[in-house]
A protein has these predicted regions:
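Flexible coil/linker segments and helix-coil junctions enriched in charged and small residues
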Residues: 13, 24-25
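Amphipathic alpha-helical coiled-coil segments
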Residues: 38-46
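Short amphipathic alpha-helical heptad-repeat segments
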Residues: 2-16
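Short, charged, amphipathic alpha-helical segments
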Residues: 26-37
Length: 46
């Protein structure tokens, strides 16, 4: 379903966020964090 796809993408982005923060790549981390917020909002509206 669409929700499963979005949840999979959310998990992928959260993994990327953790990696970027660990590597102290904060610009990319901020971009990914914004995508996560957008995706969480979209999932909550399903």
């Amino acid at each position: 379903s669409q929700e499963d796809i979005l949840l999979g993408e959310l998990a992928r982005l959260q993994t990327m966020l953790a990696k970027y923060e660990h590597d102290e790549n904060y610009e990319k981390a901020a971009i990914v964090a914004n995508k996560i917020k957008w995706l969480e909002n979209k999932i909550s509206k399903l």
